[in-house]
Structures are given as structure tokens and as C-alpha cells.
A protein has these predicted regions:
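Positive-inside N-terminal membrane-insertion signal
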Residues: 1-26, 170-177
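N-terminal membrane-sensor/transducer module of prokaryotic signaling receptors
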Residues: 1-11, 51, 55, 144, ...
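Amphipathic alpha-helical segments and their boundaries
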Residues: 14-67, 105-108
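Long amphipathic alpha-helices with heptad-repeat character
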Residues: 40-43, 53, 57, 61, ...
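Secondary-structure edge/capping motif, primarily at the C-terminal ends of alpha-helices
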Residues: 47-50, 63-78, 93-100, 119-133, ...
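Short, solvent-exposed, charged loop/turn and helix-capping segments
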Residues: 86-115
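Extracytoplasmic
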Residues: 111-114, 118-174
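Selective recognition of signaling/oligomerization transmembrane alpha-helices
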Residues: 162-198
């Protein structure tokens, strides 16, 4: 024998439909909030990297080159080697690398780090080299070129990070419009269903 179960009333079905649509809208809103928080986190990391990279000494090349020139010509101004400047640039590069997502930015900052290591070795090599001519040749063929490349790679890093920041902003805007569209469609469906049932 089959039991006759009572059919849910129209009012009960409408309430279930209303709750399910409300739940759908809430899920979309929570997803939108999660996406906003994720993008905000990524955006703040990239912004922090750009700010830190801009702390790189704008006069790095000139400072290191000048100190090395004074050292090579045995001037009283050349008593201190620019190893601290090189180490600071390398440390900054390593800090930036740890928080960088963009492939081109990572490539640029890795190159700068490697060149800082090479520059440090070349500075030490000059200290171990005898003779003004030999030291001057090392200065011109190594130090000047390496400092120029390091500075260029830091600027390249900044360029790519700014581009990555722009792409994050564009992706966030596109996702927000998509989420808003989904919420609008969900609300429209809810209104249509409720109007048909009334």
C-alpha cells in the first residue's frame, strides 16, 4: 500500500525557492569578497615590491664607479671599497625576488643579484691586482659595465612589476564585472520566479 504524502503548499515551495535563490546570491557575494581580498593581497605585495625597488640607490652606478676610481688611482678618497653598496643591492634584490610573481620581473631581479655577486668578485680582484694600468683596465672593462647592468636590471624589474600591477588591476575589474553580472542575473531570475508565482 502506497502512502499518500501531502504535496507541499505553494507557500512552502515559494519559501524554499526564495531561500535557495538567497543562498545563491550569498554564495556569489562571498565569492566576490574572497576574490577582492585575494586581489587586494596580490596588489599590496606588488605595490610593496615597487616601493622597495624604488629604494634602490638611484646613484648606485655613480657611487660605486667613483669609489672604485678613487681606489684605483690610489686617492685618499678611495680608502673605502663600495662593498656595502653592492651587498645592499644584492640583499634588496633577494628580498624582492622572494615576493615577485611575474616571470619577467623575476628574471630581471635574478640577473641583478647574479651581477652583484660578480661585481663583488671583480672589486676584490682589483684589490689583488698590482699596477695602475691593470687596475684601470679591470675598472673600465668590469666595474663600469657591471654597475650599468645592475642599474638597468633594477629599472627593468620596476618596469615589469608596474606592468604586472596593471594586469592585476585589469583582472580584478573584469572579475568584479562578472560577479556583478552574476548577482544581477540571479536577482532577475528571483524576481521573475516570484512574479510568476504570485
Amino acid at each position: 500500500m502506497k502512502r499518500n504524502e501531502p504535496h507541499p503548499s505553494l507557500d512552502g515551495r515559494l519559501r524554499r525557492l526564495l531561500w535557495s535563490m538567497l543562498l545563491l546570491v550569498c554564495v556569489i557575494l562571498v565569492a566576490t569578497l574572497a576574490i577582492l581580498l585575494l586581489h587586494n593581497h596580490q596588489y599590496s605585495i606588488v605595490t610593496a615590491n615597487i616601493v622597495r625597488a624604488s629604494q634602490f640607490n638611484q646613484n648606485f652606478k655613480e657611487d660605486v664607479d667613483l669609489k672604485m676610481y678613487y681606489y684605483v688611482i690610489d686617492s685618499s678618497y678611495g680608502e673605502t671599497l663600495p662593498l656595502q653598496e653592492v651587498d645592499e643591492a644584492k640583499t634588496l634584490g633577494q628580498e624582492l625576488l622572494s615576493g615577485t610573481q611575474d616571470r619577467q620581473s623575476r628574471k630581471a631581479i635574478t640577473s641583478a643579484i647574479n651581477l652583484c655577486e660578480n661585481l663583488r668578485e671583480r672589486i676584490v680582484q682589483i684589490t689583488e691586482t698590482d699596477g695602475y694600468e691593470a687596475r684601470m683596465e679591470l675598472l673600465e672593462s668590469n666595474i663600469y659595465i657591471l654597475t650599468e647592468l645592475i642599474q638597468q636590471y633594477f629599472y627593468t624589474y620596476l618596469y615589469h612589476e608596474a606592468g604586472y600591477l596593471d594586469s592585476l588591476q585589469a583582472a580584478l575589474t573584469a572579475r568584479l564585472w562578472l560577479e556583478l553580472g552574476l548577482v544581477a542575473v540571479g536577482a532577475l531570475i528571483l524576481v521573475i520566479v516570484l512574479m510568476r508565482r504570485s
